Amino acid sequence: MAQKINPLGFRLGTTQSHHSIWFAQPKDYSDGLQEDQKIRDCIQNYIQKNMQISSDSGVEGIARIEIRKRIDLIQVKIYMGFPKLLIEDGTRRIEELQRIVQKEINSVNRKINITITKITKPYGDPNILAEFIAGQLNNRVSFRKAIQKAIELAEQADTKGIRVQIGGRINGGEIARVLWMKEGRVPLQTIRAKIDYCVYTVRTIHGLLGIKIWIFRED
C-alpha cells in the first residue's frame, strides 16, 4: 500500500505556514501546545454554541486560527468565511470571547487580543466546504448531491482541482465503505503545488462519517 503523508506537513515551509508562531524553552513547550489547543477549542465551542445559520451562506465556518505569543500578549487571528456572528454586534461578541478565552487558559499577566479576518472566497477553503457537506448530510441530503454541490461551490471559488472523500456507514449501510469524487487536478506529489487539506468528522443517525477534502489552488 502507498504510504500517504499529510499534504500540509509535506509542504510546511514552502506553500504552507505554521498556525502557531511562538518560541518556548523545551521544558515549557508542551504547556504552550496544550494552551494553544485550549484556545482553539474554546473559540470553536463558542462559535458552535452561538452559531445562527444565515440564509445567504448556510454555514459559519472557521478556516483556521493563528496564534502569536509575546511575553505580555497573545494575539489570535480567526480566519472565517462568514463572520457575521462575531461582527454583527460590533465589538461586544469579540470582547466576550476574549474574556472567555482568558478565563479558560487562566491568563493573568498576558492580554488576549482576538481579531477576525474575512476570507474573500470562503468555499475555496476545505474546512468550510467540509462543514457545508456535514450540514447537508445532517439534513438528509444524498451524499452524492452534497459532494457534487460542494465541488460546484469550490469551482466557483476559482480552484484548479478538488477531491472529496467520505468514509463510514454511508446511507446507513451495514458495511463501512469509502467513496470519493474528483474534479480537476490535485497533484499531491508536487511540493510547490499549493494544496489545502482537511479532515472533518460528522455525527449522523447512522454513526460517524469521516470527510477528507483536498483543494488545489495554484502552482
Curated annotation (Swiss-Prot):
GO terms for molecular function: rRNA binding; structural constituent of ribosome. InterPro entries: KH_dom-like_a/b, KH_dom_type_2, KH_sf_prok-type, Ribosomal_S3_C_sf, Ribosomal_uS3_bac-typ, Ribosomal_uS3_C, Ribosomal_uS3_CS. It comes from the Eukaryota. Residues 43-120 form the KH type-2 domain. It is found in: Plastid, Chloroplast. Keywords: Chloroplast, Plastid, Ribonucleoprotein, Ribosomal protein, RNA-binding, rRNA-binding. GO terms for cellular component: chloroplast; cytosolic small ribosomal subunit. SUPFAM superfamilies: Prokaryotic type KH domain (KH-domain type II), Ribosomal protein S3 C-terminal domain. GO terms for biological process: translation. The keyword rRNA-binding applies. CDD domains: KH-II_30S_S3. HAMAP family: Ribosomal_uS3_B. Part of the 30S ribosomal subunit. Belongs to the universal ribosomal protein uS3 family. NCBIfam families: rpsC_bact. PANTHER family: 30S/40S RIBOSOMAL PROTEIN S3 (PTHR11760), SMALL RIBOSOMAL SUBUNIT PROTEIN US3C (PTHR11760:SF19). This is Small ribosomal subunit protein uS3c.
